[in-house]
Amino acid sequence: MKRKIRRLATIAALSLSATLWAQGPHETGIYYQPADGKSGAELKTAIGEIVLPHVQRTYKDLWEDFKSTDVRADGKIWDMYSCITNYTPGVDQNTGTARKEGDNYNREHSMPNSWFNKEYPMYTDLHHMYPTDSWVNNKRGNDPFGETDAPTYSSAEGFSKLGPARDGLGYEGIVFEPADEYKGDFARAYFYMVTCYEHYVNEQGEHKSISSWNSTMLARNVYPALSQWAVEMLLRWSADDPVSEKELNRNEAVWIIQQNRNPYIDYPGLEQYVWGSKSDVAFSYDHYGQETDGIRQAAQTRLRDGTVYTLSGLRVDGRPLSKGVYVRDGRKFVVR
């Protein structure tokens, strides 16, 4: 009897140990576990069901929220449409009009609200809402993101551009091209939106689907949800402009306010498992992108020799490392 109890206790301890070790990135625990083992369309659906439940904000709330989500190190608003602004949060908010770039900032739906008929909860979802220069925002209107070689309007220093789509993009029409340094940010915001709102309930209690949304960037279905030219462009944008520390910090701030996350920030390259070259590869929420070959284990210690990076490419700089997988001198190692 004692032997049986001892065996059960051992099994329970091993089970608990496995659960404690099976953790997602950025202390997300088992938040993404329901998506484990899935790929392609099935993965998109599973992730959407995970991130859809969240605290809905009011449109007025966003002014205060931006003070946590979009402030630079110098205390000014982080504007992704203009490179010349230095807005003070809560002071330089748009009060009605803007006559030129640099006047004030407003609440930008990076995915234009006309595409989803101004419905909630999309209308105030912080994962695609940003404070941007009001003048540049108004120039964009509800035009899709894209790339142009012949802009009819450019913000200061050519930072953002509006004009006809370039040849070979796969789309003919007017597009708004953000700065290269933020193209990945917007791509991941779009991946989030078409994943989160695959199916949802609007403020009237109606069951809706992203297939009802209307835009040239959208496919009017739940998968792939994005039109082919948009998928190809956004995958390229995300690869060329990988997840930054700004995005990681913003994701954490939105998590605190809204209580849901953008998985395409937590798992850099996740979009490839949904739409890209890895769409037939099973997603692993706690061993994402890790290979068993060539991975070394290290004790919990300060590693002084060589520069250490996280798998997302962030430099660690010699501080005590938390549990996880890191890269040093071109080799992976695990800290347990």
Task: Please provide the spans of the model-predicted regions.
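Bacterial N-terminal signal peptides that target proteins for export
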Residues: M1-A12
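C-terminal tail/sorting-segment detector
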Residues: R6, V325-R336
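Hydrophobic h-region of N-terminal signal peptides that target proteins for export
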Residues: A12-A22
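N-terminal module-boundary/linker segments of secreted carbohydrate-active enzymes
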Residues: A22-Y87, Y273-V281, L314
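Short cysteine-rich loop/turn motifs with clustered Cys
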Residues: K76-T97, D103-N104, D133
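Domain-level detector of nuclease and nuclease-like folds
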Residues: T95-N106, S110-E291
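Residue-level detector of functionally pivotal "anchor" positions at catalytic/ligand-binding pockets or at interdomain
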Residues: S279, S284-S312
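C-terminal trimerization/auto-chaperone modules of long, extracellular attachment fibers and adhesins
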Residues: V316-G318
